[in-house]
Amino acid sequence: MRAVLLPGSGEQPTAFCYQVNGSCPRTVHPLAIQVVIYLACAVGVLITVLGNLFVVFAVSYFKVLHTPTNFLLLSLALADMLLGLLVLPLSTVRSVESCWFFGDFLCRLHTYLDTLFCLTSIFHLCFISIDRHCAICDPLLYPSKFTVRTALRYIVAGWGIPAAYTAFFLYTDVVERALSQWLEEMPCVGSCQLLFNKFWGWLNFPAFFVPCLIMISLYLKIFVVATRQAQQIRTLSQSLAGAVKRERKAAKTLGIAVGIYLVCWLPFTVDTLVDSLLNFITPPLVFDIFIWFAYFNSACNPIIYVFSYRWFRKALKLLLSREIFSPRTPTVDLYHD
């Protein structure tokens, strides 16, 4: 890092990330503020990793949870956990220091993993919406239509498509050669902002909003059908009524998860598009807040499950007790007392 005096800046020095031409300016925070931000980010990373790790463990360990919907939840939790484990620590340093100090290779890998895990999350939420739509709107055909094999196909697509899509933009020069007029503005040295250009702003918008529109339309239909079922539930047998209520409860919980996802990611996605039209005028601090608000979503789902799913709370209680070592624990029925 170096400090220089800019013309007209008086005595206020400007810091840079590297002692080279084209280096990014660096915002130097007081030590106390740095410590507070590092601690806050560390807590967020810890909640993200441990919360989603428990979801992965619970669905894998308890046999009663081996359902198509829960396998999708497991895969979603895995993406969020890996985001917290592999992406957020380096993002924390970049946010606090306002510079990237880990080299070009890690910059590209970090950007790849960041985009991969975030796109994987939205794909999985979209597939979960399809699952809930089928369970609520077509309950008689649901067991035969949405099997474990179907869920596994969705999981492969949910990871494979984002992996190929992101690799195409980051690890080939096809896009840069074909769209050079869109990519003239190169990031300064020390920013690690490989994808934030005008073309990516336009491309990122439909990648977010098309799945969102699908999810919103599916949940609107689910709401209409669930309301009708609530009026008819008195005429059903007790066992069938219980099954319908359980499916509606799951749809409601996952609908909340989708809603929180939209709220967390909407500011960043809209800003990316608008910023590309206005020649990137968003202050770095505001942009960083939008990014971390989106990251925060990865910590939300386990918290939602704690308040919404009795089986999740029961599994957590077993995990924190000696009963977890009992050979009978994996076969415990978490849905009933």
Swiss-Prot record:
| MF terms (GO), sorted A to Z | trace-amine receptor activity; trimethylamine receptor activity
Q: Name the reported effect of residue 118 to A.
A: Does not affect trace-amine receptor activity
From the Swiss-Prot or TrEMBL record, state where the protein is found.
Cell membrane
Please summarize what the entry says happens upon disruption of the gene: Mice lacking Taar5 show decreased sensitivity to trimethylamine. Mice lacking Taar2, Taar3, Taar4, Taar5, Taar6, Taar7a, Taar7b, Taar7d, Taar7e, Taar7f, Taar8a, Taar8b, Taar8c and Taar9 show no visible phenotype or behavioral deficits. They however show an absence of aversion to low concentrations of amines such as 2-phenylethylamine, isopentylamine, N-methylpiperidine and cadaverine. Mice show less anxiety- and depressive-like behaviors. Mice display an increased number of dopamine neurons and adult neurogenesis.
Report whether Membrane shows up as a keyword of the record: yes
The record gives the effect of mutating residue 99 to S as: Does not affect trace-amine receptor activity
For this UniProt record, the keywords arranged alphabetically read as follows:
Behavior, Cell membrane, Disulfide bond, G-protein coupled receptor, Glycoprotein, Membrane, Receptor, Transducer, Transmembrane, Transmembrane helix
Membrane topology term: Multi-pass membrane protein
Instruction: Describe activation and inhibition of this protein.
Output: Inhibited by 1-[(5,5- diphenyloxolan-2-yl)methyl]-4-(2-methoxyphenyl)piperazine and N-[(2,2-diphenyl-1,3-dioxolan-4-yl)methyl]-2-(2- methoxyphenoxy)ethan-1-amine small molecules.
Q: What is the effect of changing residue 24 to S?
A: Decreased trace-amine receptor activity
Q: Which domain of life is it from?
A: Eukaryota
- Which GO terms of the cellular component aspect does the record hold? plasma membrane
Please list the disulfide bridges: 24-188, 99-192
Give one GO biological process term: cell surface receptor signaling pathway
Tell me what the record says results from residue 265 to A.
Abolished trace-amine receptor activity
**What does the annotation give as the result of altering residue 114 to A?**
Abolished trace-amine receptor activity
| Keyword Cell membrane belongs to the record | yes
Task: Please give the residue ranges for the topological domain Cytoplasmic.
Answer: 60-70, 131-154, 226-253, 308-337
**Where is the chain membrane-spanning?**
39-59, 71-91, 110-130, 155-175, 205-225, 254-274, 285-307
Q: Give the residue ranges for region: Extracellular Loop 2 (ECL2).
A: 176-189
Q: Which residues are glycosylated?
A: 21
Further details from the record: Trimethylamine is a bacterial metabolite found in some animal odors, and is a repulsive odor associated with bad breath and spoiled food for most organisms, except for M.musculus, where it acts as an attractant.
Known function: Olfactory receptor specific for trimethylamine, a trace amine enriched in the urine of male mice, playing a role in social behavior. Also activated by N-methylpiperidine. Trimethylamine is present at high concentration in the urine of male mice after puberty and acts as an attractant. Trimethylamine-binding causes a conformation change that triggers signaling via G(s)-class of G alpha proteins (GNAL or GNAS). Also required to provide olfactory input into limbic brain areas to regulate emotional behaviors likely via modulation of the serotonin system.
The record ties this protein, via PANTHER family, to: HISTAMINE RECEPTOR-RELATED G-PROTEIN COUPLED RECEPTOR, TRACE AMINE-ASSOCIATED RECEPTOR 5
Q: What is known of its domains?
A: In addition to the well known disulfide bond common to G-protein coupled receptor 1 family, trace amine-associated receptors (TAARs) contain an unique disulfide bond (Cys-24-Cys-188) connecting the N-terminus to the extracellular Loop 2 (ECL2), which is required for agonist-induced receptor activation.
**UniProt name for this protein:** Trace amine-associated receptor 5
Task: Supply the source organism for this entry.
Answer: Mus musculus
User: In the UniProt record, what gene is named as encoding this protein?
Assistant: Taar5
